[in-house]
């Protein structure tokens, strides 16, 4: 199982939101590149980057930071947040980003998403955020009528091989993740490599996710608060 420590960017700083709420934001570092180097030193091979400004208003205000992270090297980087056009995908891939994560646009413009999956293959992942089992979009403000599992099946049929699935209720809450959910996803949509995201806060959970065949896990707040030690987690999932 792969681990993706997370860097959420707001105005060039490393922050965490609680349950996607911009008014409940904590700044953890003023220097994202230094933070990435810390992760690398702890044995990380991957990095999950979210452009929160992009997600909110579609701007590219964290472009320089993301370019610097990619240039620094050593880590496979996936980027999400505000990626709604092919131009933006090209922009990030040209920086050396490993893959782009499509979020709300996958729900609002499924045809576009299917085209991008066909054209870029494994350079595209889809981020599915679910609230009470239903797909949520636009910074989790709107909830659609489609169950998350059904949406994942549709994505798989369109050629999607990687989905980052977040249970909103768990995200940034440090109360543990929804293990049953990832078990269901692995069983119902076996062709997709799922990344577990949201609320992972114990080594036992990581081991459980690994055991059920989850492809990857994103670690955010648990690393910043010291609840989990990255070097130890890297060791655990490799054993």
Model regions: which residues?
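Charged helix-capping and loop-helix junction motifs
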Residues: 60-67, 141-150, 175-184
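Glycine-rich, proline-tolerant flexible connector loops at the mouths of alpha/beta enzymes
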Residues: 46-64, 104, 165-175
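Conserved beta-strand positions in the central sheet of alpha/beta enzyme cores
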Residues: 48-51, 78, 101-102, 125, ...
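Glycine/small-residue-rich loop that forms an oxyanion/phosphate-binding "nest" at active or ligand-binding sites
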Residues: 53, 58-118
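Conserved anion-binding
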Residues: 11-12, 19-23, 90, 97-171
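Conserved, mostly hydrophobic/aromatic
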Residues: 8, 39, 47, 92, ...
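Catalytic cores of alpha/beta
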Residues: 73, 77-99, 180-216
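Glycine-rich phosphate-binding active-site loops on the catalytic face of alpha/beta enzymes
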Residues: 83, 94-112, 167-170, 198-202, ...
């Amino acid at each position: 199982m792969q681990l993706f420590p997370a860097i959420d960017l707001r105005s060039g700083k490393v922050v965490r939101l609680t349950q996607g709420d911009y008014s409940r934001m904590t700044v953890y570092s003023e220097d994202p590149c230094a933070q990435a180097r810390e992760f690398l030193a702890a044995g990380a091979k991957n990095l999950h980057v979210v452009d929160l400004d992009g997600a909110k208003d579609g701007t590219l205000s964290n472009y320089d930071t993301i370019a610097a992270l990619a240039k620094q090297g050593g880590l496979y980087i996936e980027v999400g947040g505000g990626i709604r056009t092919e131009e933006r995908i090209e922009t990030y891939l040209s920086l050396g980003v490993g893959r782009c994560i499509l979020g709300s646009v996958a729900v609002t413009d499924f045809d576009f998403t299917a085209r991008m999956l066909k054209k870029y293959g494994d350079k595209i992942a889809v981020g599915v955020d679910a609230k009470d089992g239903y797909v949520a979009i636009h910074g989790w403000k709107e909830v659609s009528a489609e169950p998350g599992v059904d949406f994942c099946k549709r994505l798989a049929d369109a050629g999607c091989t990687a989905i980052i699935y977040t249970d909103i209720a768990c995200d940034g809450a440090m109360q543990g993740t929804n293990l049953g959910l990832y078990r269901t996803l692995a069983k119902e949509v076996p062709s997709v490599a799922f990344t577990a995201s949201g609320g992972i806060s114990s080594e036992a959970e990581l081991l459980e996710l690994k055991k059920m065949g989850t492809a990857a896990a994103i670690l955010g707040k648990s690393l910043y608060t010291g609840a989990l030690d990255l070097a130890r987690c890297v060791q655990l999932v490799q054993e």
